[in-house]
Regions:
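Eukaryotic all-alpha helical interaction scaffolds
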Residues: 75-76, 117, 159, 211, ...
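Residue signature of alpha-solenoid helical repeat architecture, marking inter-repeat boundaries
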Residues: 84, 126, 168, 172-175, ...
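Gram-negative bacterial Sec-dependent N-terminal signal peptides
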Residues: 2-23
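N-terminal leader/linker segments that initiate helical-solenoid repeat arrays
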Residues: 22-92, 96
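Charge-biased low-complexity segments
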Residues: 26-28, 32-38, 62, 80-83, ...
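Helix-turn-helix repeat elements of alpha-solenoid scaffolds
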Residues: 57-73, 102-113, 145-157, 193-209, ...
């Protein structure tokens, strides 16, 4: 049964209310400005007007959600609990709840929508994918990393059941989930987060093996995956050094995965540097022998190889790789622009190569007062530092801390900067000292 006139009318009312909320969010009382170098945040909205506007939005949103729920109940009463229309309605409700930072309620709505799709479309239907992505995003916003990880694995498992384990359509998802695990470890780095490194290494190894076997060993898609695999082995070497007793209880492999490429035994032999070096050399071979490879990708990969050597304590090898990045650009029209992007300012290491994430149709409209409040609640320290030609920080000046009077944040940032390495700035082909370099350091709760 389709929509009744009453249900349709209710949904039109909900849409008009939500449109009004979005319009008010898109035209805030005053703009929020974040300057381009991220060194200073200027909130141009007074707290009073921000609170008033936020309260008005909250009332309108609550009314819209209540009407949405009423429409869902009415449709269920008229068409039954498994009517396909309900899956779309509950998914839309989940998006609305998520947009308004009501993440636990959003997860419940997404799960109901996903269940309805399983009933109507089949257990392995990819129609569940948008709901799973909504669940993942909500768990991440809540800081529920284990739950987000489980949902990511369910997403991968669903694609494997649909396509099989050797289908090239798995490659972008393996890359995406591998990158998420790598970034999650980079942000957390606790003893028990070893699991994220294991998952990332398995996924990248699987994606590399599948790409090479199905698309060819010189396919350009391999380059970024090889570089991120190398970075994951660096983090593993670092984890082994920080937590030498962590290897006795590594945790189980996520379901739906099977190992490819490097074995666990090989990865535990202390050959992390050699494994990563082999990945970078493989990436460079692909770029050197592929006439379609962009020249800037070659320069960037040499720069990343330099970063890799710097992180492992081989400054001479790092300098050689940085010089090779300069050399491959000889005679290139955009040479100065590319070099400025790579070496025009110090870059904190390590750097993860970002990949585009598949859209889940879950959008976040700009200008929402909740977004402005989240910026107000953000914890950060603005600093001015001096970076030597060897990539070490020697001087740190605190410019601003938010929230104020938080010496523990300043201590964390200083400790992090002193222990970090930077790709140094280059001028006229040589690494040079950089003074008064400003940075914004985010400090997670």
């Amino acid at each position: 049964m389709g929509f009744s006139q009453n249900v349709l009318g209710t949904l039109l009312l909900v849409t008009s209310i939500l449109t009004g909320v979005a319009a008010s969010a898109d035209t805030p009382p005053a703009p929020l400005a974040i300057n381009s170098d991220d060194s200073v945040i200027d909130i141009n909205t007074t707290p009073a007007s921000l609170e008033l506007s936020s309260a008005q939005d909250s009332i309108a949103t609550n009314l819209a959600i209540q009407n949405y729920l009423s429409a869902i109940d009415q449709q269920e009463n008229e068409a039954g609990p498994y009517d396909p229309i309900l899956s779309e309605m509950t998914y839309g409700l989940g998006n609305t709840l998520q947009h308004n930072h009501r993440y636990e309620e959003a997860i419940a709505a997404y799960k109901r929508s996903m269940h309805l799709h399983r009933v109507n479309d089949g257990v392995y239907s990819l129609s569940q994918v948008p709901m799973l992505r909504g669940i993942i995003k909500s768990h991440i916003e809540l800081g529920s990393i284990n739950e987000a990880s489980q949902s990511y694995h369910q997403l991968l498992w669903l694609h494997m059941k649909t396509y099989g384990e050797n289908d090239v359509r798995l490659i972008p998802l393996m890359d995406e989930v591998g990158q998420w695990h790598l970034e999650t470890y980079a942000q957390m780095g606790r003893r028990d987060d070893l699991y994220h490194l294991q998952a990332s290494l398995r996924l990248y190894s699987s994606a590399i093996d599948l790409t090479a076997s199905q698309l060819g060993s010189t396919n350009l898609q391999l380059v970024d995956m090889l570089n991120n695999f190398a970075l994951a082995t660096y983090y593993r070497a670092l984890h082994e050094r920080l937590y030498p007793d962590a290897w006795g209880n590594p945790g189980g492999a996520p379901f739906g995965y099977r190992p490819f490429g490097f074995s666990e035994e090989t990865l535990r032999r202390g050959t992390h540097y050699l494994n990563g070096l082999a990945s970078y050399r493989n990436a460079l071979d692909i770029l050197e022998n592929n006439p379609d490879a962009p020249i800037q990708d070659k320069a960037e990969t040499y720069a990343q190889l330099g970063d890799w050597n710097l992180l492992f304590g081989y400054p001479d090898a790092a300098t050689e790789a940085y010089h090779q990045a300069h050399s491959v650009l000889g005679g290139v029209e955009q040479k100065d622009l590319i070099l400025d992007a790579l070496f025009g300012a110090p870059k904190m290491l390590p750097r993860i190569k970002k990949q585009p994430v598949v859209s889940s149709k879950v959008s976040k409209k700009p200008g929402n007062n909740n977004d402005r409040l989240s910026v107000l609640n953000e914890r950060y320290v603005n600093v001015s530092i001096e970076v030597t030609s060897e990539g070490r920080v020697t001087t740190i000046d605190i410019l601003k801390t938010h929230p104020e009077n938080a010496p523990e944040l300043e201590t964390r940032v200083k400790r992090s900067l002193h222990s970090s390495k930077f790709r140094p700035r280059f001028a006229d082909g040589h690494a040079v000292l950089t003074s008064d370099f400003t940075m914004k350091m985010l400090t997670p709760h």
